A protein has these predicted regions:
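ATP-grasp fold ATP-binding core
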Residues: 2
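Short beta-strand-centered aromatic/proline hotspots
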Residues: 52-57
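Sequence-specific dsDNA recognition surfaces
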Residues: 5-40, 63
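Amphipathic alpha-helical coiled-coil/heptad-repeat segments
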Residues: 75-77, 84-85, 90-94, 111-167
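A short glycine-rich beta-alpha junction/loop motif
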Residues: 60-68, 100-127
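Histidine-centered metal-chelating micro-motifs
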Residues: 49-50, 67-69
Length: 167
């Protein structure tokens, strides 16, 4: 089971997630707390809108209520477009100014947030834009993954180099 603290830029970090029983998972699934492909997952408690990503594969993993699931109506807005809009600094500021409550633990009030309006291009224009945005997002994700692999490699090799150990 994931919470906001497990969210990263492109998905969940499962290193510290809480494991729950099959029975509890089924209850959460019945409560619609298991993301589906193309759902937009949004950190809504604490650092609201800090982490936002598209669920790219169905998994048997539940999320806590600190994460909102936005399930776009694809007849109106495509998931890539909604993701792009929600990541805009102007949207984040507007949401912070108008749809967040609480000072110690700020959180998005979802019933109010549903009133948020975007000006959207036609679905044809969205499809063209979504293709470009998806390709850019995937390239960035690949770059982030490669950077993490290189960091791990550096952290493994550097101590050996410094100590004079043969590699």
């Amino acid at each position: 089971m994931y919470s906001v603290k497990d969210m990263e830029t492109y998905g969940f970090n499962s290193n510290n997630c809480k494991h729950i029983s099959e029975e509890d998972f089924e209850k959460m699934k019945a409560g619609d707390c298991v993301p589906k492909i193309n759902d937009i997952l949004v950190a809504k408690d604490g650092s609201y809108l800090k982490e936002i990503f598209i669920c790219s594969e169905e998994r048997e993993e539940a999320i806590l209520s600190s994460i909102a699931i936005f399930r776009p109506d694809k007849k109106k807005i495509l998931p890539e477009i909604l993701l792009f809009l929600l990541k805009q600094p102007s949207v984040r500021k507007d949401v912070g100014d108008n749809f967040v409550s609480g000072s110690a633990l700020p959180r998005i009030v979802l019933k109010d947030f549903k009133k948020y309006q975007f000006i959207l291009p036609s679905l044809n224009a969205q499809q063209d834009l979504a293709k470009m945005l998806n390709s850019i997002r995937l390239q960035i994700q690949n770059n982030v993954d490669e950077n993490q692999q290189l960091t791990t490699l550096r952290d493994t090799l550097l101590p050996k180099l410094i100590s004079g150990e043969e590699i």
